[in-house]
Amino acid sequence: MAQQPPATPQPEPATAPSGPASVPDDRIIQQRPMGKPLPPVIPLIDPSQVAPPSPLLPRETVPIPDRWRLTDQLKLVNQRWFDPYNPNELKGDRPIHGEDWFFNLSVVSDTVFEPRRLPTPIGAQSTQRPQSNDQFGYGKQSTFVENLIVSLSYLKGDTTFKPPEYEFRLVPVINYNYTTVKEVRLVNIDPRRGTTRRDGFVAIQEAFVDYEYRIVSERYDFDDVRVGIQPFISDFRGFLFQDQPIGVRFFGTRDNNQWQYNIGWFRRLEKDTNSGLNDITRTPRHDDVFVGNLYRQDFMVPGFTMQGIVVYNRNHETAQQFLDDNGFQVRPAIMGDARPRSYDVVYLGANGDGHFGRWNTTASLYWAIGHDDHNQISQRSANINAFFAAAEVSRDFDWLRVRGSLLYASGDKDPYDGKENGFDAILENPQFAGADTSFWIRQAVPLIGGGGVALSGRNAVLPALRSSKDQGQSNFTNPGLLLVGIGVDADLAPRWRAIANVNQLWFNNTSSLSALRNQGDIDRGLGTDVSVAVQYRPLFIQNIVFNASAAVLIPGKGFKQLYVAGGSNTPYSILANLVLTY
């Protein structure tokens, strides 16, 4: 049987309304025949909040001198002169006058205590122990040094976006040093001065005017000139020249800082002997350095910077002999016939620093060519032709960095052939293979002349046979060096960092050593340098940093042949350093 369709429901009969129908407010607003709809009423989320200003009242504004003082108007920060972390006029956080004239004050206390033991010759005229009959005496020494560095910088410009337009900087340094040794005629040429020395000095390490004379692009590429006593480093690791000389330097950038250049002339200043700081009370040396270099960022791959450099060193210090503050002759060095000499040398170099993927890489290559008017050993003029190469590769594994280091400096093959093939720098300060935590780099080991000529200089890696790294002249008749090293940097904790290095050292050629010591064949084995260091930052920041290190040189056969009378004690160097920064 067919199904019937469902019945349609019938509406209920309407009843007469008892009153007007209820209509929502929003429908009333929409049904208004004329005018704009009123804005919706926003309920108060927080009844205690401050009501917004009325649109019918005039706007109340308080003018302020500049945007840096907005925090003062809002009472967000109370400036304290001793607080370097919040807005502070002494730290260049806000203008001291005008709209963009700033002042920046930095104070650093650098304290060093350094016990060490190294081969030490006995005094020539006298000795601390009258019954001594050896060539070498007691080698224990210690030095305490305090440097108070005050940096004053007055500059104009908005440094957030571009370099300063003007900068005037002055950096005085107050130094105190105390040294004690076990043998006379080390701290002073006069043996009556004993075995201790207290000294102090006030130096000017920086005093220059910097002027940005041109902006060359919308990305603030610039040309700048700096005149006065200024810091300069020739390459990434300080292999060739790092100093605070007086001079003129033009520098700038192009192509959004991808190209950088330096063109400069510098004249080296005399140094205070016991502090190593500039002595502006003396006439500058007749030692000129002309530099031109060009940097390219993101060379070949992003993150690697390449530098090409040409340096001309013109040293014409032939007027007279020069004695240091302790009475020792440093120019010319007391070796050979010790007559005054001059030399002209050009360094052609290429340097790189950065990373290829996860591999951190730094490399340096130099070729030195020039002329020495008087070789002190052969007693005639000589041509300079020497090479230098260094590389360091490292990789990070989480909190651990593993490094490998290689350095080669050519050595002189024959001191009498009219050629100088031993590489020497102008004034080096290498940050390489452990740097100043290494015994070989940190300590100057005496060689001949009662210590008047050292095997290598203080904070130097090259065995240059110079009287003084700071006050002496370059010497290209030297044995050269081969260094192979490995190292580890470990970030143990946010406060703690540990560093360890092992470097194996060889001379490249010992002919110059044999000539100076009047000694037969000397082995190339120099020794093994082992060092460990730790850094502690109690507040996780760089304002308080404590560094400590210990290093030993395990003598090789060649070192033992040079210092056979120096006893069987292993040379060592210990360093404790506290740096406080404001």
PLM feature segments, named:
Residues L406-A409, K413-G525:
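C-terminal structural cap/anchor segments
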